[in-house]
């Protein structure tokens, strides 16, 4: 399993923070944790609540990551298919997918 280079870790945090700022005003900040080939991303909401969102798996490219969604029902991350139909994609696609599920109010 590939270890994520420090430059890629830094780039990942920069990219996700920029995407959250422009696309998800409900997110006050992101917390990114790295271990081995994985990165876990949590959203910090304006009220201070921490919301686990995604787990990314480094596949050797800064633009193509495996995607796991946090499932509150089990407290675990499970590999998922992105809206593009792929199991892999950009970090921004993964963040958008999770935020659409967890932060958007349903239209009834």
Q: What are the functions of these language-model segments?
A:
Residues 42-44, 50-69:
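Short, conserved beta-strand/beta-arch hydrophobic-aromatic motifs that form part
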Residues 1-48:
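Negatively charged, low-complexity tracts enriched in Asp/Glu with abundant Ser/Thr
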Residues 1-11, 69-108:
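Mixed-charge, Lys/Arg-enriched low-complexity segments
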Residues 17-19, 23, 61-73, 105-108:
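Hydrophobic transmembrane alpha-helix bundles
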């Amino acid at each position: 399993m590939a270890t994520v280079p420090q430059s890629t870790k830094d780039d990942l945090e920069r990219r996700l923070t920029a995407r959250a700022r422009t696309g998800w005003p409900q997110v006050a900040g992101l917390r990114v944790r790295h271990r081995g080939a994985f990165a876990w991303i949590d959203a910090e909401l304006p009220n201070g609540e921490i919301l686990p969102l995604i787990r990314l798996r480094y596949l050797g490219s800064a633009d193509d990551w495996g995607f796991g969604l946090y499932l509150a029902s089990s407290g675990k991350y499970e590999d998922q298919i992105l809206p593009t139909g792929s199991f892999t994609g950009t970090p921004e696609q993964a963040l958008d997918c999770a935020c659409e599920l967890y932060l958007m109010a349903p239209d009834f």
